[in-house]
Amino acid sequence: LGDVYKRQTLDSTEIIVLATAGGLFLIQIIYYLCLYNRIHARSRAVKQGDTHFTQELPPISVIICAREESENLRRNLGAVLEQDYPQFEVIVINDGNTDESEDYLTILEEKYPHLYHSFVPDSSRYISRKKLAVTLGIKASKYEWLVFTNANCMPQSNQWLRLMARNFTSRTQVVLGYSGYERGKGWLHKRAAFDNLFTSMRYLGFALAGSPYMGIGRNLAYRKELFYQQKGFSAHLNLQRGDDDLFINHVATPENTRVETDANAIVRMQPLLRAKDWKEEKIGYASTARLYHGMQRWLAGFETLTRLAFHASWIAAMVIGILHFHWLAAGVAFLLFLLRFTMQAVIVNKTARDLEEQRRYYFTLPAFDLLQPIQSLRWKWYCLFRKKSGFLRK
């Protein structure tokens, strides 16, 4: 009887590990319910008519920066030019002259009188070419409201501009939209698609919670006046990146920022084919994330830390329980994992459905849940040891 009693009594190590797993579980629950569920909650509120939008449709300047992307322009530009919107112009800034982009844009201008294009001079040396392209597009624009996307992005409907514009209230200066991938095959694309979805749930979730801290230029709008008030990119002119995320980090406030989550306001990119492209994109954002103002960066990092610690603690508690024949302790540890997984699967997949992502995450979710923060730490670690000159303008 004494041996049985000892087997059922948890030692101090088991109690500490199990209590740690329980505490980390509660932290993760708070993050999912209060942050990652925001997009789904907003989508539901919009459907129920609980969100205010403006009825005005001010003229818009759409700015697209393309770097030798004639194929992307042929594929995607038509969907931008044929938006159902009363008054807008499309400005394409072409960086590079080694492909057919220039000829194609010249021909297209004859069909679409609201299309204009310019180019980045080859001699430009004192500002990153992307920031120069954005600046040239803004200076060439006629209208106050600027909407940005990339040449490799296609709006999912002709209502994209109308849905972005319904957020252009008198107090609004910044509108953040969602950009995703078209469905593709392969492990690389699946990882990138989940990372993109989860990253969007995070930064759009913060914005919907009243704490905007970044934006992505694939689907973004702001006022021209705001750009000039900030003297363009002067605050980080020495960096290659930062034309979208770092700029929005400096200008976005709870009062001046709104988020558009309608599925018809989404732009999508083609599936990833090369790991190098994804790596460069992630490293680029990791290099500017170090300069973000506000607590959001640290709160996001804390979620990553508690996620990894939770997985380590529940696994440790279950293994120790099994080795000591404490089946109740092992069962409680596994139950914590199961409860978090269930809540996570519900929120992630509801958000994916709201954003019309074609992929759902069930059996692959635990793997992506571990890989995503490890990948994030990998990019940050790479930035830490990469020469600073690699992130400066050339």
Feature locations, PLM:
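Membrane-embedded multi-pass helical conduit in multi-pass membrane proteins
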Residues: 307-389
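Short beta-strand-to-loop acidic/aromatic patch adjacent to the donor-nucleotide binding site
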Residues: 143-154
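Short, small-residue-biased leader/transition segments that mark boundaries at the very start
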Residues: 1-5
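Long helical/loop segments within the catalytic core of UDP-sugar-dependent glycosyltransferases
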Residues: 112-133, 137, 143, 163-234, ...
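N-terminal membrane-anchoring/stem segments of glycan-assembly enzymes
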Residues: 6-54
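Short, well-formed alpha-helical segments that are part of the catalytic scaffolds
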Residues: 41-47, 69-82
